[in-house]
Amino acid sequence: MRKWNYQEALAQFFTSPVQSNAPEEHLVISREKSVIAQVLRKYKNPSFKLQSPLNVQFLSSNALELGVDAGGPTTAYFFYLMQDLMRGSFNGIQLFQGEAGHLVPSVDYDLVSSCFFGIVGKMIVHSFLHQCRGLAGLSPAIISYIISGTRDTVLEYLVVDDVPDPCLREILNEVKV
């Protein structure tokens, strides 16, 4: 399998976002459970097509909610998924640290070595492809890194507020003055 760089991957996705003639991907989401835990296997599966139309249904109290996915359930699904990613409500694992607007990925060997952030990236791209807003609250330095793929561009966006540890942030602010 050919490995693309980020520019080729984005160009591929955005030249043909959602392919309306492709078979639908069906998702049934329980409102009582973590959304990440319910869809993780889908995103790990290479046959899961991000560009296929989605048909999302929600379960409440073990009963399917009535309705047709004309866009509302899909938007709600991505809203809840991005909320779970920001809160880190996946088996108690905190995926991002810091405050809103300055969130940075957690430094966790298991998350990095298992390529979990690659799956998180697929979830975010999937959200964009379906005209949803993606993951809000990331540090501008992290966004710069995602876009450029190089650490050099991060420095111009890096600020003390990007340090997730409040004690260390306070010390850095004292040194800065």
Write out the residue ranges for each language-model feature.
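Long, Ser/Thr/Pro/Gly-rich and/or acidic low-complexity regions in intracellular
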Residues: M1-V177
